[in-house]
Amino acid sequence: MLTLGVNIDHVATIRQARRTVEPDPLAAAVLAELGGADGITVHLREDRRHIQDRDVRLLRQTVRTHLNLEMAPTEEMISIALDIKPDYVTLVPEKREEVTTEGGIDLVSNFTRFAQVVDQLQGAGIPVSWFIDADPAQIEAASKTGAKFIELHTGKYAEALNEESRAQELESLKKGCEQALSLGLRVNAGHGLTYWNVYPVACLPGMEELNIGHSIISRAVLIGIDKAVREMKLAMRGQV
């Protein structure tokens, strides 16, 4: 059954805007789980613009579903992951000047080093997911690194300017999902998904989990996190 991972980064974004102690991402995680979240996702960025190290450590102790740690494949982040041991890690590209992650990681150009990263993390019992575009070469490379999962980048689908472009991007995601499954990879997806565009992605055969943050937190500002999560789960079933 398709599951929902709720990204709570932007709860921390609001907190860090004033460098204060609230709103607390831990409280947000609890409410998200009460609302039906199947997992909690946080991105510990190198610049610490929202989620902080302390948040990840406390979430590791309090999350009752599963904790997905998004991070760049750097030595610093690998060391943190090996210490905290999240339920799994999603490795993403990162640029300091970007507002949010802009695309999938390039495994083809950095294959040897990234395969070693997978060995390090999975050797310590931490399953690895690669955040990649629905590109056949990248999916093939992800499989060859030995990773357990991929997360397909849905940004191009979400940002498509017309229905024709959106249909083309959805077809690319469908083919990417099929290829990944044929290679023995488990498939997640995320980036830019909202209440209004999530259902077609949720219908893709073999899709395991959708990771969604900004849309849920934006809605939660108005109606509360638990209700916003419930509504997203309805949207994933085409009931919104």
Curated annotation (Swiss-Prot):
GO terms for biological process: pyridoxine biosynthetic process. Keywords: Cytoplasm, Pyridoxine biosynthesis, Transferase. GO terms for molecular function: pyridoxine 5'-phosphate synthase activity. SUPFAM superfamilies: Pyridoxine 5'-phosphate synthase. The keyword Repeat does not apply. Pathway: Cofactor biosynthesis; pyridoxine 5'-phosphate biosynthesis; pyridoxine 5'-phosphate from D-erythrose 4-phosphate: step 5/5. It catalyses: 3-amino-2-oxopropyl phosphate + 1-deoxy-D-xylulose 5-phosphate = pyridoxine 5'-phosphate + phosphate + 2 H2O + H(+). One of its GO terms (cellular component) is cytosol. It comes from the Bacteria. It is found in: Cytoplasm. Its EC number is 2.6.99.2. 3-amino-2-oxopropyl phosphate binds at N7, R18, G192, G213, H214. Its main location: cytoplasm. Homooctamer; tetramer of dimers. This is Pyridoxine 5'-phosphate synthase. It comes from Gloeothece citriformis (strain PCC 7424) (Cyanothece sp. (strain PCC 7424)).
